[in-house]
Amino acid sequence: MSQKDTQQEHAERANPVHEQDNAPRIAVVTDSAASLDPKLVQRLSARGNFVLVPMPVTIRTPGEPDRQLQDLTAAEVDEAIMLAHVMGQTVSTSGPAPGMFADVYDDLASRGFTHVVSVHLSSELSGTVEAARTGARLSRLGSEGVSVVDTRTVAGAYGHAVVRALEVLNSASAGSSVECPSPGYSTPNYPNPDYPTAAQLVDYIQSICEQSTLYFYIPTLDALRRGGRVSPALAMVGQMLQIKPIGTITEGKLTYVERPRTAARALERLVEVTVQTCRDQRHAAALTSAAAPEMNPSPACFSLKATPRGEVVAVHHVGNAAQAVQLYEQVQQMLGESSLVHDTADSSAPEVLVSALPPVLSAHSGLGAVALVVY
């Protein structure tokens, strides 16, 4: 069976409650910078209402053909990028072309989807959002049929929002319940006879992203310098002072939280700032819950409310998976909780998303990087 036939079969199984004519059907599109594990992507794609668009990564050597990395395994990518940095080769990244997005949107339209929610990394870090918007205008659905979301963040900080949005769609299409809280309630599930609108889904995704915080550790500024993310002067100073930065994303841009001088101290502080953010979110949620008036939930309501729990929801690494998971477990221990890491292959939506950073991000972070996402 060809890949196109397989996609068609998946599409026919997607959203079974809405197979009648003129019924709304929503698909979700994202890019590889969402940092979703390949096994999870395969499982999410099985319903036919999800597409991940790859982002090209190229190693350039003068006098030699460019080398593309997207078809390599995670281990091969780590090795290729490490060798490229050692040999002084240029590792370049780029967003998908508008035509690629237009083709994806057209394919989804041909399979009966009436709207696409296209979710992408911060426009401050990449031209992907603009390419998606241009692709929407070129597609059969047009700008009216494609909602492009500028998440203003990166990696699992929006990757987990994509997973949660798909959970909502798939639960609604299966006729089961989704989170439908009235004011003062944050956990109960009620029967949901309706299907979310694209606008509701966009608001839900944006709310999750706004309330998610990503912290990352990179062992050297050199990879960021090669990718043009920091100036050569700053990278040189960082190398001279042996700076091991801890960073985050603020208003869509890369910013630094601290600049420790040793790897051990940097990793220690990464855990500490992550724990503090978890505690701050939990405290804020408790205050909000205490201040909310007591109201009886209505079984007929349909509402999507993003409610952060002050937990680590994603863990990323570049060639150091064991270390990344160990840091996550340290966070859990300091919070007095057990680890929630599961094998991605065993669940369509694991409680904690653990994945290698994709080439489009690892090219800039370098080997040994770690990232933790709190929501």
Regions found by a protein language model. Give the residues of each.
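Actinobacteria-biased recognition of intrinsically disordered, low-complexity terminal regions
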Residues: M1-A23, S177, P183-S186
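Mixed-charge interfacial surface used for oligomerization/domain docking
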Residues: E19-R25, A33-L44, F50-V51, M55-E64, ...
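Generic signature of intrinsically disordered, low-complexity segments enriched in small/polar residues
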Residues: V104, L108, V116, P183, ...
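Short beta-strand segments
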Residues: V29-T30, S118-S122, V373
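Local beta-strand N-terminus motif with an aromatic residue
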Residues: R25-I26, F113
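Short beta->alpha junction loops
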Residues: G95-P96, D150-R152
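Class I S-adenosyl-L-methionine
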Residues: P62-S118, S123-L138
